[in-house]
């Protein structure tokens, strides 16, 4: 199966704020520009029977609704950062960020989810998938899906900096094709 992962448009939040699972909308201009950029590129896949899924968070569903009929799935949501949500990264105590960096898979940032827990729900979504799909979601979700599809250790994936831009597309095969 082919998976086309799409990161949501830029959210309507100040730069430098931790927003993980907070249900903030996409910025209006970013949404219209993102739709204009993606609609033509995704049209052939959607017209050929790819199913459309979305994280239930507004910054994703707003784009998905412009692309077509979609199925929201909570397993596609971004990581919950607990008490860190909607706080400036600069206001989160350094010792807490350092504790997360020392245990990327099992530390609970702000008392929220662990990376391992997010990976388990993402894996569950992938395991149930039976058809080609376009998935509107988040950079964290996309990175975990890519790691799972590539058979990459989660620790290695979690340690990589995020380079996925807003409205960027990532194409994967699932299950991964054997060589």
Residue ranges with predicted function:
Residues 3-4, 50, 128-140:
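Generic beta-sheet signal
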């Amino acid at each position: 199966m082919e998976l086309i992962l799409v990161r949501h448009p830029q959210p309507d939040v100040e730069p430098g704020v931790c927003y993980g699972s907070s249900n903030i909308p996409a910025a209006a201009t970013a949404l219209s520009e993102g739709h204009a950029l993606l609609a033509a590129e995704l049209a052939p896949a959607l017209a050929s029977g790819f199913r459309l899924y979305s994280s239930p968070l507004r910054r994703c569903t707003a784009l998905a609704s412009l692309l077509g009929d979609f199925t929201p799935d909570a397993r596609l949501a971004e990581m919950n950062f607990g008490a860190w949500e909607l706080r400036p990264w600069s206001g989160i105590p350094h010792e807490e960020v350092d504790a997360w960096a020392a245990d990327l898979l099992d530390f609970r940032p702000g008392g929220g989810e662990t990376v391992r827990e997010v990976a388990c729900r993402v894996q569950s979504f992938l395991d149930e998938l039976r058809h080609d799909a376009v998935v509107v979601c988040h950079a964290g979700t996309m990175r975990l899906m890519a790691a799972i599809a590539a058979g990459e250790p989660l620790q290695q994936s979690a340690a990589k900096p995020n380079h996925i831009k807003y409205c960027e597309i990532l194409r994967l095969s699932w299950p991964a094709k054997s060589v």
